[in-house]
Amino acid sequence: MNRFFISTLLLLAQHLAPAAASCGLANEASLSANEVQDIYHDFVATSINYADLLKRNEDLNASLSTGSPVEITSTSCTTDTSASTPIITESTSSTSSASTTGSSSSPLPSTSTSCTTSTSIPPTGGSSSLSTPITPTVPPTSTSSTSIPIPPTSTSSTDTNSNPLPTTSTSCTTSTSIPPTGGSSSLSTPITPTVPPTSTSSTSIPIPPTSTSSTDTNSSPLPTTSTSCTTSTSIPTGGSSSLSTPITPTVPPTSTSSTSIPIPPTSTSSTDTNSSPLPTTSTSCTTSTSIPPTGNSTTPVTPTVPPTSTSSTSTPPPPASTSSTGTSSSPLPSTSTSCTTSTSIPPTGNSTTPVTPTVPPTSTSSTSTPPPPASTSSTGTSSSPLLSTSTSCTTSTSIPPTGNSTTPVTPTVPPTSSSTPLTTTNCTTSTSVPYTSTPVTSTPLATTNCTTSTSVPYTSTPVTSTPLTTTNCTTSTSIPYTSTPVTSTPLTTTNCTTSTSVPYTSTPVTSSNYTISSSTPVTSTPVTTTNCTTSTSVLYTSTPVTSTPLATTNCTTSTSVPYTSTPVTSSNYTISSSTPVTSTPVTTTNCTTSTSVLYTSTPITSPNSTSSSSTQVSWNSTTPITGTSTSKVTSSTSIPLTSTNRTSTTFTSSTSISTSSSSTATSSTSFASESSSFYSNVTTSSSTVSTPPPTTSFPSTFTTSFITSSSLSSIPNNSTEVKTASTSSGTEIKTASTSSGSSSSSSYTPASSTSTTTSSVSSRQSSSSSSFTPSSAISTAKSSFVLSTLSILIALYMVA
């Protein structure tokens, strides 16, 4: 066969000589028998797997007559296994390593940003299962999701909470957040809201359920308070209260806001007490349900309200004429309102079943106002509680229990009452000042075509809330329980919402789209928004925390900080790391850029691309190689495989090809693994871009510029040398590099096909990267002739 091959080469050289002569190459282009034999031996010496090349280029002979231009893409990759905790940076293709001084025993929250509809169900600990996917119907345009679970570092803190605090969710459309704690979590029925294709935002911030030492603790969850856009009436009960006919005013379908203000149920002393609750007034457009149980109870407290009721102006008088200095160990009233449907039910302890109340899909509002159950003696009496009445979309009553009790406190009061109506004009601004031991000043909130309410929770020091000003929208500010005074500054938006979450973590992480704080105050960088709503949520902390708005354009940014130790799936790509990660912002048009930072010990899968490893993380970026006209370039897939050996390796390859026509394609997959004694097979795949045949005839092929290059590598087992032979433009090039085990990348592109193959083999303890980039298109007839001859020789050998 060798004789036949050499004879064929000589015959081809003789037949091609006249064509070369027509190009002025009569004396230069022919190949002697020795030259042909040298070329053959060089290819054989490099251990070329011709069968594999033939399989990937079955159309080589047919495409040789087209003379189509080919763009060559070379991929360079560096693998580093020197440490097990890398830091991710964005580059064309890079991985790096870094060590961290912190340890982690439980996960911290994750942040999710979304442009259309975002559904976040972050279970904690153990395993998580979801039998039916949550599939909201959204348009096929701009969506993004950012999931940022932080390493589960065990750190000590002066402000802790043994149970999760309530979650605050703000939405323009629909958002569902059900973060259970401990054990395993399951959700048998999907929550599938249908939303319009416009901006939505959601903020879900559960707090770590870990027990740590603290100077300010709370053994049961606090009530949540949220505010929004129309008006509702709150009826505090001693006994039971019911409302047979809902008051349903007509409100515009725009602007919503939500403010969540948990109140501590701690025992405090006061000089002003009342054994029955004061009424609260809230406003709402639709439904918000918040039932925070206490202690390790797995059953939510669900007060039973009779199906019949009286109007919204009825109010119970105090059950007794008593007053005195005393303490109250039950939670204070909470007022919640919202603008579409938002359900947030954070159970506590090791509960494995989420609390899922059934709520109608249309506007309702709930106001819960439990009285303090403490018996107090008094220096004065009150004949009946104060009452404020306003308009409402629908009214419901919830009563948070106290301590570890699963039964709500329900004092019995006489059925007499009095009421004083409130007058509203197309909008209502309400201020609710709960029970406190020191004076609390609440400033009204000014809105336009909407209602904003401010709720000041129970605190040991005065808390002042400044007004919020909005235009055709509502902006909310939430001030949580804190040991020092916290002042919330106004948020101003224009017909849109942007949310910022400042969670609780041990190491700060900063990016253009989100900010995660440490145990010390963290300030997030403001981002200007258009056509959205802005919401700021400040979590439980020992020192004041200031958060400034984030900004997007024609989109809504949502930040979700869940708590998870299991893999998270991202729609675009996922990156894992055990140390803080900084991502470089990506600018898009009519789209949203998503960044995922995930801590996990198992591989992660996602539709587009995924990178996950217990010791290495790779960040992929593609640079398109363009021809005369580029249509579009997409990106890569990276699958790190880890063996049982101590050292695991990762490899990331990225190829992108654009032809001179308007077609594009990108695809590259690379697998790398190792065992204790030998290398596994290297599996490569190629991407092919089909181009329309040119209008030129076959003889003109010799004057058409195109490239044929091959880069071939062989790595013997435990070898210390990698031999790479490359042939480009008819010139033989040999390069060799040595290392103690190495990684190499090879690419092969035949004369008239458009495929790029990348492969990588990583050895133990070290890695290196080699890349081969062939020269650009040949412009002279001589080089083109030599390339054509060489391509035909290779093809004939493979066929033979």
UniProtKB/Swiss-Prot annotation:
Keyword terms of this UniProt record: Secreted, Signal
Domain of life of the native organism: Eukaryota
UniProt signal peptide: 1-21
GO terms for cellular component: cell surface; extracellular region
Amino acid composition bias (Low complexity), ranges on this chain: 73-314, 321-368, 375-444, 451-470, 710-720, 735-776
Bias kind Polar residues: ranges: 63-72, 721-734
Subcellular location: Secreted; Cell surface
Chain positions covered by the region annotation Disordered: 63-470, 602-670, 710-776
Main location: secreted
Protein name: Uncharacterized protein PB18E9.04c
